[in-house]
Regions:
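NAD(P)-cofactor binding segment of oxidoreductase domains
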Residues: 92-113
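N-terminal Rossmann/SDR dinucleotide-binding element
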Residues: 1-84, 94
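Active-site segment of SDR-like NAD(P)-dependent oxidoreductases
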Residues: 87-88
Length: 113
């Protein structure tokens, strides 16, 4: 499974489309904040990838990525990962940027360790 963060954002969506083209047999696990689940499902439908992707409601700022009991099973299935979830607005408060961009990245790396 190719694990992605950052979908349905601009970069994450384009990377997923590219990976789907270059890895036609791959499946995707998409870590998505619950508030973006519907948008993500629409993107998957638009790209004709709904049958190849599993939407994983979660949050990179949580130690277990919000995956709870599914954490280990998901980690065991990952063959490739691309972490694109981030806050790009430099005017945000420092603590928010740190929590998402630094701590969130650490949590994704922990999943892959």
């Amino acid at each position: 499974m190719i694990f992605l963060t950052g979908v349905p954002g601009f970069l994450g969506t384009r990377l997923m489309r590219s990976l789907a083209d270059t890895h036609p047999d791959a499946s995707f696990g998409l870590l998505v904040q619950p508030k973006f689940e519907d948008t993500t499902r629409q993107v998957l439908d638009d790209l004709d990838l709904a049958d190849r992707a599993e939407v994983l409601p979660g949050d990179i700022t949580e130690p277990d990525l919000g995956l709870g009991d599914r954490y280990d099973a998901i980690a065991d299935r990952i063959t490739m990962a691309c972490h694109l979830a981030a806050v790009y607005d430099l005017s945000i408060p420092r603590d928010v940027g740190w929590r998402v961009n630094v701590t969130g990245t650490r949590h994704v790396l922990d999943l892959l360790d």
